[in-house]
Amino acid sequence: NVDFAARRGILVCNCRGENAQAVAEMTFGLLLCLLRKIHLADRYIREDHWKRTESAALPEWAMGSELKGKTLGVIGLGQIGSRVARIARGFDMKVLAYDPFAQPQIDALIDRTALEDLLSRADIVTLHVPLTPATEKMINARSLAMMKPNALLVNTSRGRVVDEPILFEALR
């Protein structure tokens, strides 16, 4: 709370963009964990399930899938979102992006599109927007209904960008 800090003489600074690379890398860490099922395979091994099978190989469900060829939808092309888009190209992903405020000279390999188009085409949607009245609950029942049934959603923005009770119901 900035007002609280100011009343106590505590200086609060906004170091905009200082953590952009770290957040972009975390986004891909989360994507890799979800797609490659790293968390499930880790649990499987730690619980010694692999010792109970004829083969020491992980079961097929633990193999996950590749990022290559997937379509990534990036919502917000600021310092973080644009870095996420660049990293995605290194994984041979197709990149769709929505940001009504981004500069028009953004990378030619990024397909700028409408939010509705991005949501309906992306295999993975990542959120990189500030929390404003316009972005609060931008991922809601309507936007979730536009997404592919097996699409992944990674939010490294503020929590309230996603209507979490609606997301919880959609996941049921």
Spans of model-derived segments:
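An N-terminal-biased, well-structured beta-alpha scaffold segment characteristic
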Residues: 1-15, 120, 140
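A short helix->loop->beta-strand "cap" motif at the edges of active sites that frequently abuts
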Residues: 7-11, 93, 149-151
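Short beta->alpha connector loops at strand-helix junctions that form conserved
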Residues: 9-21, 99, 157
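Phosphate-binding beta-alpha-beta segment of Rossmann-like dinucleotide-binding domains, i.e.
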Residues: 16-71
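Glycine-rich Rossmann-fold phosphate-binding loop(s) that bind the pyrophosphate
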Residues: 77-78
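N-terminal Rossmann-fold NAD(P) dinucleotide-binding loop
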Residues: 81-82
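Residues at the starts of beta-strands that form the adenosine-phosphate
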Residues: 85, 93-94
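Rossmann-like adenosine-cofactor binding region
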Residues: 96, 100-172
